[in-house]
């Protein structure tokens, strides 16, 4: 796709969390940027720690008796972790030559996207997810729901090999 008429940059809204620093998403952003002037607005939902596929919060040593350890994190902790991921991703994309910034949004990715689009219109949405066997977002049919709700084209980037580095 090319930039809209008048040479204004094409605006992409990227929603990701655990795959935000994946090579696959960075390559997709590079590919889109190669189509012409573009800007990327990253939306990182403040996902509760207990909902992550891989827990990213270090825990102090503690005995676990009678069952699995429950991961409980505060909303503030979720926002802090999301902000750290966002800052690292913006820095990485700048190093790759992309114009990018972003925000931490609601824990619900659809609500986070809706809030971001009210403030910053976009021409296309890019959704990056874990592999289908692990992705809550795919079980919720997020890419299709966003396309239907906002009437924008949606590119889905599935990261096929999710590792601890991607957490």
Q: Model-flagged regions — what are they?
A:
Residues 1-5, 94-123:
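Structural beta-alpha unit
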Residues 128-145:
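Glycine-rich, Arg-bearing micro-motifs that act as flexible, cationic patches
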């Amino acid at each position: 796709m090319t930039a809209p008429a008048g040479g204004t940059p094409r605006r992409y809204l990227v929603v990701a969390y655990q795959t935000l620093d994946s090579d696959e998403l960075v390559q997709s952003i590079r590919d889109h940027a190669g189509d012409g002037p573009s800007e990327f607005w990253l939306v990182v939902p403040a996902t509760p720690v207990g909902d992550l596929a891989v827990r990213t919060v270090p825990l102090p040593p503690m005995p676990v008796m009678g069952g699995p350890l429950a991961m409980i994190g505060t909303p503030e902790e979720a926002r802090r972790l999301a902000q750290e991921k966002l800052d690292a991703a913006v820095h990485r994309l700048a190093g790759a030559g992309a114009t990018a910034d972003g925000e931490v949004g609601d824990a619900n990715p659809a609500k986070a996207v809706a809030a971001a689009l009210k403030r910053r219109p976009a021409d296309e949405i890019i959704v990056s997810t874990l592999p289908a066997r692990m992705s809550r977002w795919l079980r919720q049919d997020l890419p299709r729901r966003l396309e239907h709700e906002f009437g924008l084209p949606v590119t889905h980037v599935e990261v096929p090999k999710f590792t601890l580095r991607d957490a």
